[in-house]
Amino acid sequence: MPELLLLNGPNLNLLGTREPGIYGSDTLADIERRLGEQCAGAGVRFSAFQTNAEHALIDRIHQAGRAGVDFILINPGAWTHTSIALRDALLGVGIPFIEIHISNVHAREPFRRQSYLADVAVGVISGLGVHGYELALQAALKRLDGSPRGQH
């Protein structure tokens, strides 16, 4: 059975209360529940992890590599624009991933327009609100389509 991991970076635990005009009113728990249900229906194992500590996210990526996780969906939050270490961790484990952003980072401050992950991601979804998570999941499920890791 394929396995998918959802990763969320700093401040995403505040979804539902943090700047709802930008990020909406859905909580991270709402998003995780919906994605988990969709994965169950598709016969895919699902797990989720959120942290405000960069080293913890990197450790979780390393663990995913050892565990044979097949695909990662990641909203790296502000680490998108700052973390070469996160990029190196994702490259190091070789798990395909899709980068997700709730807001349109290209319509915001100039410093948010640089991603250290986009060029090594399978794809990037930005600016479609929390619906972007479900779109990323649909793409990941289609890409997995029961194929073993390394054949994506």
Curated annotation (Swiss-Prot):
Residues annotated for substrate binding in this entry: 75, 81, 88, 102-103, 112
Organism in which the protein naturally occurs: Alkalilimnicola ehrlichii (strain ATCC BAA-1101 / DSM 17681 / MLHE-1)
Record's catalysed reaction(s): 3-dehydroquinate = 3-dehydroshikimate + H2O
Keyword terms of this UniProt record: Amino-acid biosynthesis, Aromatic amino acid biosynthesis, Lyase
The EC number(s) this enzyme carries: 4.2.1.10
Role this protein plays: Catalyzes a trans-dehydration via an enolate intermediate.
Molecular function (Gene Ontology), one example: 3-dehydroquinate dehydratase activity
Protein name: 3-dehydroquinate dehydratase
Active site: 23, 101
